[in-house]
């Protein structure tokens, strides 16, 4: 598997540093947390203690790059503990036969490596006609935590 950490961000269409700089230029307040590279929700839960407290909890998410039977590219964002049933999701978003997209297609369409999928990858995904679907309950979260295009950083 190709490394998805910030050490290799220069190989991405949009670097993590560039994304963070854009937030700052636009006056969007973010906090950046550096940690070991994490590729799964289980690994992510191990580093959450670095930045979570009773006052700064929030929405920890999982992100799935999917394709349907018609080759439509989809980014699904849900609460990290949500059980995902692709058949149910396919019905909800009016698609047929959802499956996980390949790592090559992930990079071509969202500009990130496996383990670093994030809503921020729509910075590349929009121009590649990737459709974004977010779980409604995430709107109730005070903060959302996501990778800024690499998997050894988290921003809120």
What are these regions (language model features)?
Residues 1-156:
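Extended, low-hydrophobicity, polar/charged segments
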